């Protein structure tokens, strides 16, 4: 009787662990764009941490600007994966496929974010823009590499 109870307990324990391991662990899937969004997944591959990342976007002639920073004022880690979304409702009747140009600005030291995206020149590094045809409902992957000494580069991953 004790042997059957022990086996039953072991089977139940294995089943519980299996369910927990498959259902309790979070999904490793990257966020996907909704049908009315263009999602940019920006992988930092830098030699040092940075203060902020500013994005100046031109979507079929409509210009917007924004930035990414940590709410706790800590630096963005050199290997962070950042998520940036362009929503269709922010633009006036865009087509499903648009010409998108993104110019990144790396702010090397933390500065308080501001609506004008105006930061000290000595901390600001302007990257060459990347341009491509983008479709709403699609996620694009961009990698930013480099360092303060040699400069930074942004590239659309294929």
Q: Where would I find each of the regions flagged by the language model?
A:
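C-terminal motif of bacterial Sec signal peptides marking the signal peptidase cleavage site
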Residues: 19-23
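Asparagine-centered strand-capping/turn motif at beta-strand->loop junctions
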Residues: 31-32, 38-51, 57
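Bacterial N-terminal signal peptides that target proteins for export
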Residues: 1-10
């Amino acid at each position: 009787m004790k042997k059957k109870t022990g086996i039953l307990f072991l089977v139940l324990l294995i089943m519980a662990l299996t369910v927990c391991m498959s259902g309790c662990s979070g999904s490793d899937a990257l966020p996907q764009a909704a049908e009315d969004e263009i999602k940019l997944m920006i992988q930092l591959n830098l030699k040092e941490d940075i203060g902020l990342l500013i994005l100046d976007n031109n979507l079929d002639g409509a210009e917007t600007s924004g930035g990414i920073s940590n709410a706790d004022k800590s630096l963005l880690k050199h290997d962070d994966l950042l998520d940036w979304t362009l929503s269709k409702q922010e633009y006036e009747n865009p087509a499903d496929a648009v010409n998108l140009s993104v110019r990144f600005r790396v702010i090397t030291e933390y500065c308080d974010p501001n609506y004008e995206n105006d930061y000290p020149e000595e901390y600001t590094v302007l990257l060459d823009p990347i341009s491509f045809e983008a479709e709403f409902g699609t996620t694009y992957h961009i990698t930013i590499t480099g360092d303060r000494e040699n400069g930074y580069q942004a590239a659309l991953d294929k």
